[in-house]
Amino acid sequence: MKDVEDIHRPMLNSLQSTSAKMKKIVLSVNAGSSSVKISAYSALFGQAPIQLAEAQISGLTAPPPTLRYTRHGEKVINDEEVKDQKVSTQADAFDILVKALIDDNGVPEISSKEDIAYICHRIVHGGDFVRPKLISDETYHNLEKLNDLAPLHNSTSLVIVHRCMSDMPKTTFNIACFDSQFHHTIPEHIRTYPINQDIARNNHLRKYGFHGISYAFITRATAEFLGKKVEDVNIIALHLGSGASACAIKGGKSLDNSMGLTPLAGLPGATRSGSVDPSLVFHYASDVGKLSPASTKDLHISRAEEILNKQSGWKALTGTTNFGTITAALDPSSSDTTSHLSPEEVAKMRLAFDIFVERICAYIGSYYVSLQGQVDALVFAGGIGEKSDRLRAAVIEQVSCLGFGPVDKEANETRVKEELDDSHDVIEIAPPNSKKGGKDGREHRVLVCKTDEQFEMARACAEDGEFWR
């Protein structure tokens, strides 16, 4: 006798086939400590999503909060102060953004919450999850446990996940997309820390790697630009922003990432120290093992975590988190805002810039050896990677001995600004070098990629048959 599933299988297959042909609305959500960003897409199963609108509220930790709203690539609201509405948490910001989307007559596809089929949440630390995960109550509780590994990173996202699970229609599926999942291919000898392995396993202590959603996008965009299959691409990718990392990608898969157990390891950032001698923090302050005043009942943050994550980086060196201010100070003629700086202040800016360049180049050299010189491209991405032509030029000059560069000045300074937009994901800023590396003689290209984590999450959802129901 056939079981119920066998009897209804043709009907289930027919329903799934019909569902695959229907356009659905996918919402990508990226929650940070001071901002929340959502992007709405129309998608068919197995096809690239089409963006309908994008909205962001910034300034949650530095009021007043401001709203930015874009429809079909055109700015509708540009950093307008949010008034007459409570905005004290990420969940509050999310509610306002969804309402703005629903109230926009220019996006008729979304007239109510019921029109949203999927919500993709960027979760920084996914532990041992190796692919996006449909969020059930059990999954949510597992993600809560990961807060111990990433209290400063996962908690903001889970606030919105909880709001969606309680307030959005039951027909809306919540999907967790993890920044760490791209790096599950890092080999054991690279991801393992040389500590007692029984303790390491019991406490999940190993390198995880992060910025993986961005690196997945960068890898696909670079492969398309080079006219290669993803599985044939070897690149050294740099995601450079207020949080920065480097990644060695071999055959389209992560071989190594500069971040580790948490995003703190590796490159310095706006407020992160990056990798330092582990004993440094114990000499820095006497209370590093105590809980930070920023801790709450459910969120335990040590003073050490607070110092190295929130009170370090180039802010500690210069007093600013804005890398653009640092680079402008090195070329006073380019900005009136830095002309008042004293020679001592300019020297601090120079030190921060030089430290960042040196650390980046150290990873490029290390990863070049890991890839045995078989590197298709060095790829810059992230806010700083996309915007700072001075940084790109300095890095390329220092790694020119490996066969990268020389920089095309016009491409680096002008074309990137003018052409790197939604229609151009990748711009080449140095011609293929005649010096070829590795046993297979690959040409070393230098590229700038406009990464898009929001799109990457929506794409992953649209291509996964498990979610498309």
Curated annotation (Swiss-Prot):
Gene3D superfamilies: 3.30.420.40. It comes from the Eukaryota. Substrate binds at residue 122. It is an enzyme of class 2 (transferase). The keyword Membrane does not apply. Keywords: ATP-binding, Kinase, Magnesium, Metal-binding, Nucleotide-binding, Transferase. The record marks 211, 272 as: Transition state stabilizer. ATP binds at residues 37, 239-243. Pathway: Metabolic intermediate biosynthesis; acetyl-CoA biosynthesis; acetyl-CoA from acetate: step 1/2. One of its GO terms (biological process) is acetyl-CoA biosynthetic process. InterPro entries: Ac/propionate_kinase, Aliphatic_acid_kin_short-chain, Aliphatic_acid_kinase_CS, ATPase_NBD. Mg(2+) binds at residues 30, 453. Belongs to the acetokinase family. This is Probable acetate kinase.
